[in-house]
Amino acid sequence: MENYRSRHNELTKKIDSEANLTNWQDWKWQLRNSIQKISTFETLTGIRFDAEERKILEQTIEKFPLSITPYYLSLIETNDYKNDPIYLQSFADPRELIVQDWEQADPLSEDEDSPVPGITHRYPDRVLFHISNVCSMYCRHCTRKRKVGDIDFIPAKDQVQQGLDYIRATPKVRDVLLSGGDPFMLSDEYLDWILTELRKIEHVEVIRIGSRMPVVLPYRITDELVAVLKKHHPVWINTHFNHPRELTTSSRKALAKLADAGIPLGNQSVLLAGVNDCPRLMKSLVQKLVYNRVRPYYLYQCDLSEGLSHFRTPVGKGIEIMESLIGHTSGFSVPTYVIDAPGGGGKIPVMPNYLLSWSPHKVILRNFEGVITTYQEPENYDDPGCDGDCDKCTLQLKFDDAHEYNSVGIWKLLSNWDETYSLTPENNERMERREGAADGMGQD
C-alpha cells in the first residue's frame, strides 16, 4: 500500500504541482487528467518509445482512442511493462490495427437487435439499455470499440426517454441492464432520474448496472452515489476484474461500500492471452473476489471484435481453466465460461463434460478428480408432462403467469404443449429442394 501511496503522490505532482492526494482521490480530477496522449504516458511512466514505435502507436490511437485514468496508470509495473497485465489492458497495441477476415465491428449484432436507439433486446425478458457512450478508461479488449471513444457523449433525456418508452410498452421485460460505455460516468442526479423512471414501470423487477469503475476508477464509488443506488433496490452491479493485481486497497474499499449498502455484486472477466490465461492466476482472482463479496459470474471467451486477435486464446484454454476451478474451489467461486455467439445468438455456456453416458436406468458421471461413478435413475418417476396449462397444474405455479411463457429452441422441442418436432437452419438445401418439388407438383 505504501508503495502505491508513494506512486500516487509522485504522479499527482507530475500531473499538477499544486495538487495533493485529496485531488488524486477526486474522481472528477481523475477524469480531467486522464492520459490520452502517448507523450503524456511517456512523461508520467518514464517509458520511452522510439520514433518508429511512436508512429505506429499514433496510428493505433487515431483509430482506437487512448484514455487511462491516473489511478489505473499507477498500477503499471514499468520495469516489465510489456508483460504487465495493467499495461496490456489499457495502452495501445499496434496489433489492434490487424483485422482478421472473421472479425466484425459488431460481432454480437447488438445494433441489429436494437428496436429503438439505446436498446438491445435479445433475450425474451430482459434488455440492454445503453445510457452512456463514455468510459473513464478505454479498455483495449472492448467488444464495443465501434462505439466507445468514437462518438463520445452521454445521451440527452429525450434520447433516454425512447428507451424508457420501449421498456414501458414491453411487459415481458422484467430485467434491465444499464450499460454503455459506463453508466457511472453519468452524474448522480442523472442516474437517479433514470433509475426513478425505471422503478415507475411495474413490470421491471430487477435493474442491473455494468461498470468497470471499481476496477479503473474506484474513487467514483462515493457515499453520494451509493445513497442513490440504495433508493432503488433491487439493484445489482456487475463489474469487470480481469487480474488479481486490480484488487487494490482502493478497489476493495469501493466494493465494500457497495456490498455494505446491500447491493449484490458480480464479476465478468474476459479470458485474455498474456493477461489472465493461467489456471493458477484465475483461481487466485476468483478467490480474492469472493473474499471481497463479489460473486464470479461469467468468464467470457474474447469476442470476435475487430483488432482483438492478439487477445484471443483457444477455447481449450478456457476449458483447462474451468477444470482447474470446478471441484478445486468453492462452487460459488466458479464463473460460467461462455462464448457470446456471433450474430446475436447470445451467451453459450462452454463447460467441461462430466456426463459420460446414460441409459434409462443409470447415468455415468465423472468428477473433478477423474473418478467415474454411476447415479441410479428413479424407477417410478411420474412425469407430470407439462402441457402449458398452469390452471390445472398441481405444482402451485398459478400465481406465476407461467402459461404466458413461450418456448423457443431446444426447450420448444422438449415441451409437451408445442407440436414442433425439429428445428431447421435457414438456407437448408434439402428443405429448399422439398419446397421446389412441391411447387412443381402444383403446376400442370
Language model segments and positions:
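Flexible, acidic/Gly-rich N-terminal and inter-domain linker regions that tether
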Residues: 1-121
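C-terminal accessory regions of radical SAM enzymes
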Residues: 322-422
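Conserved, mostly hydrophobic/aromatic
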Residues: 72, 135, 139, 297
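Short, charged beta->alpha transition segments
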Residues: 114-117, 127-130, 161-166
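Conserved AdoMet/S-adenosylmethionine-binding subsite of the radical SAM
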Residues: 161-171, 184-329
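A short, charged
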Residues: 78, 83, 111-115, 123-125, ...
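Canonical Radical SAM [4Fe-4S] cluster-binding loop centered on the CxxxCxxC motif
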Residues: 121-158, 209
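Conserved catalytic-core segments centered on acid/base and nucleophilic motifs
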Residues: 129-130, 142, 175-184, 207
